[in-house]
Amino acid sequence: MNVLSCSINTLNGLYDISGVEVGQHFYWKIGGFQVHGQVLITSWVVIAILLASATLAVRNPQTIPTSGQNFFEYVLEFIRDVSKTQIGEEYGPWVPFIGTMFLFIFVSNWSGALLPWKIIQLPHGELAAPTNDINTTVALALLTSVAYFYAGLSKKGLGYFGKYIQPTPILLPINILEDFTKPLSLSFRLFGNILADELVVVVLVSLVPSVVPIPVMFLGLFTSGIQALIFATLAAAYIGESMEGHH
């Protein structure tokens, strides 16, 4: 009975921890569901920035690229290189997915440092980078999970599931657990780094408003770019792994 009671108390404690939220949130009711309004607002802003930038850069393509077109061609070539390195020769269909992930995360991360979200007042909570919310990073990680399952199944059919009993059926639970830990590691790594960066800047601004935060903000911009690259690279690596069938 004591063991059972301790187990129940442990589960209750874990349930309480799972209900803890980081900061206050501004909620919207959409179709009976409660969603974080500030995340949707900032995500729409990021998407609008990406669409507007791409439209302006390629609306009148030139044989000799202009500055904007040249920049986006460089970004596309960079994403192609990352995809080809991680996925292999069949990387082509996955370039749009990897590129979307990289650009959305990159602009989201930078928006937390460059856009004055704090001046927009909300009834509850405050605006911040979309990747500062665990819901966004988990959603991106789940999309990646769907992508690599789809890649494996489309390439190998039901034979894809044979990887779970390789090299021995004894490893079946571990191999299954590995596929669940991939999205967890992706989401928490991105969320933790972006949240920590913004918290450090806020604390330093409150202590020394004009001097110390500047180098920290530049470091944050560099870190934000690295996090976007890591996420996109790992997503491509997982897709390539599912298509090749080896670890």
Curated annotation (Swiss-Prot):
Annotated TM spans: 38-58, 95-115, 134-154, 199-219, 220-240
What Gene Ontology cellular component terms go with this record?
Answer: chloroplast thylakoid membrane; plasma membrane; proton-transporting ATP synthase complex
- InterPro entries assigned to the protein according to its UniProt record, in alphabetical order: ATP_syn_F0_a_bact/chloroplast, ATP_synth_F0_asu, ATP_synth_F0_asu_AS, F0_ATP_A_sf
Looking up SUPFAM superfamilies in the UniProt record yields:
F1F0 ATP synthase subunit A
Q: Which UniProt keywords apply?
A: ATP synthesis, CF(0), Chloroplast, Hydrogen ion transport, Ion transport, Membrane, Plastid, Thylakoid, Transmembrane, Transmembrane helix, Transport
The record's note on quaternary structure and interaction partners says: F-type ATPases have 2 components, CF(1) - the catalytic core - and CF(0) - the membrane proton channel. CF(1) has five subunits: alpha(3), beta(3), gamma(1), delta(1), epsilon(1). CF(0) has four main subunits: a, b, b' and c.
Q: What is this protein called?
A: ATP synthase subunit a, chloroplastic
What's the encoding gene here? atpI
